[in-house]
Design a protein with these regions (language model features):
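Active-site glycine-rich loop that binds ribose-phosphate moieties when present
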Residues: 1-4
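C-terminal catalytic domain of Rieske-type non-heme iron oxygenases
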Residues: 9-10, 14-246
Length: 246
């Protein structure tokens, strides 16, 4: 056959494919992010993630280039205007920048994560998540097209499927700690609510990134400027694009 072998790896239930023979191994590529998250969850904890069969997936369509979705995910600058509900309890000033070195990922973290689910029910947490970090959650874009969210009680991967230069399919996969949290009737209402929350938040971004696509087509657009205070992670991604794609 004419099939050619390509390198692939599985990490956090995601399959990563590398068609370039001149790139480093995936283990080396992912090590900076994996090491960073060791302070939250151990390797044993990571093995506990289970995908939810009922409320573990949704997809969104965006009429824009995939890179705008990554740009948007990297920064918290837009929170007050795009996500007023989220910003009411996780304000822009509660976030911090993440700039992975070497330049392979970037994003933001929050210091006030506190699940806003109805009633007294709560999801089980990762057993080794430090008590002094229980209100920390991190949202990282792993270049080129994967967005990740790690919390004490659930994890998600939000990956982009570029259809063409101005149309992108977004796929959200949600995981919980153990099969009981992910699939039992006991936690079904909580899963439904968490699913609704994340779909609502991510849907709020679609109009914005589609507007970014339209804005780039304006003859008045001159390339734009980065905020030296708020756009550091986004600038990190732009540097990756220049180095690896352009």
């Amino acid at each position: 056959s004419n099939l050619k072998e390509i390198r692939s790896s599985i990490w956090l239930d995601l399959i990563f494919v590398n068609i370039s023979n001149n790139e480093i191994s995936f283990d080396k590529y992912i090590k900076p992010l994996s090491d960073r998250w060791e302070k939250f969850w151990s390797k044993k904890d990571r093995k506990l993630i289970v995908h939810s069969d009922d409320y573990g997936y949704f997809n969104l369509n965006a009429k824009c280039n995939w890179k705008f979705a990554i740009e948007n995910y990297c920064e918290s600058y837009h929170l007050p205007w795009v996500h007023p509900g989220l910003n009411s309890y996780s304000k822009i000033e509660d976030h911090y920048h993440i700039q992975g070195l070497p330049n392979r990922f970037a994003g933001q973290g929050t210091t006030v994560y506190n699940p806003r689910l109805k009633g007294k029910g709560k999801f089980p947490c990762f057993p080794n998540w430090p008590k002094n970090k229980e209100h920390i959650a991190e949202y990282v874009a792993l270049f080129p097209n994967v967005m990740l969210g790690v919390h004490k009680d659930h994890f998600y991967s939000y990956w982009l499927e570029p259809v063409d230069h101005k149309y992108t399919k977004e796929h959200m996969e949600i995981y919980y700690v153990g099969d009981k949290a992910a699939n039992s009737k006991k936690y079904k209402s909580l899963r439904k609510e968490n699913h609704k929350l994340w779909k609502g938040v991510q849907s709020e971004d679609v109009d914005i990134i589609e507007g970014m696509q339209e804005g780039r087509n304006s003859p008045s657009y001159n390339g734009g400027n980065f905020s030296p205070v708020m756009d550091n992670p986004t600038h990190h991604f732009h540097k990756w694009v220049v180095t690896n794609i352009v």
